[in-house]
Amino acid sequence: MKKVHERFLEYVKVDTKSDETTRVTPSTKGQLELGKILAEELKEIGVDEVRISDKGYVYACLKSNCDKDIPKIGFISHMDTAPDMSGKNVNPKIVENYDGKDIELGNGYTLSPSFSPELPMYKGQTLITTDGTTLLGADDKAGVAEIVTAIEYLINNPEIKHGDIKIGFTPDEEIGEGADHFDVEGFGADFAYTLDGGRIGELEYENFNAASAKVEIIGKNVHPGSAKGKMINSILVAHEFVSMLPLDEVPEKTEGYEGFSFLLDIQGEVEKTSLSFIIRDFDKEGFKNRKERFNEIAKELNKKYGEGTVTVTLKDQYMNMKEMIEPRMHIVETAEKAMKQCGIEPIKNPIRGGTDGARLSFMGLPTPNLFTGGENFHGRYEYISINSMEKAVEVILNIIKIYAEK
């Protein structure tokens, strides 16, 4: 039987960086390649009903081995890695018996406790890091490896009783499209867990309400020598727009349950400037107010510079899954129990982001999020503890056992 980290090291060889500009699903060929590898591997270890959809989603089912009426549990992870950094030619480094000090990644980069204060907690463990030139891909290939390893363990140990176990691997989660074509009905689970969290112990069932905002500003360009009273510099109007938002309600100044507006991108010249924002808030009313503020600013600036100068386009992305999880809190409580059984203290913090599970919960499949063990996702300083990965496998197995024993 393969060890979980061995699987992980195989999966990261496949470049699955997603790309929101391609407008196809999956957005990159590497995701389809990994999906085919996973489907074949699941068949080889004895999983039933393995299929890949025309959109690259991998679905499988390990059939029940007992007569009891046991809930059908799903486990889901995503195959893509973040567009933030290259996932090509990932060259993982194994750091055995970590000494708690700086780790030289190579290529002039160092992973240090001063940058990652949590590092010393992994002293004595074996870590997998990058070589400094790419991300690692623990988000979320660690989750994929943990699910496959847990399933293989069940197959190799048939004395462990379980109901139907549903498996799902999705593309394009990192660009917000992971649930777009997910076949909830065909998946057939009563509820599910995503393996897409970070540090060991993380158990998440609250996430941001999320929207995107596109702001387009139309200016008027005339010769600067005769511009007085005529020119409207769209770049400066854009600056004015941003300054009218709460200046302290930005990602770098917020934490916990605090929301924000985040200016992601600005492209402009005198006659036209475009701004791209994301809007985030845990509270429904606060979320509504943040979106309304964008429209109010546009209204004020249009009054000042002329109707049609500023246009705002808002688009909801996902909502806080808490309201869909709370009526079935046994899903969360079972995960807590499963963690405690293997010596892990659950960490229940809100997700300052989103997962496939957030949208799936609103599609009728309640899906809280479990840890994978990774740290510093989406960049060259990403790493993961093999011990944490092994514990994630244990938690999956414990959840399955708890429901089988009820």
Curated annotation (Swiss-Prot):
Can you tell which superkingdom this protein's organism belongs to? Bacteria
Residue positions annotated to bind Zn(2+) 2 are 139, 174, 378
Its annotated compartments are:
Cytoplasm
Its recorded reaction(s) are: Release of the N-terminal residue from a tripeptide
Give me the comment on cofactor binding: Binds 2 Zn(2+) ions per subunit.
Q: Hey, which family's this protein in?
A: Belongs to the peptidase M20B family.
Q: What is this protein called?
A: Peptidase T
- Which gene codes for it? pepT
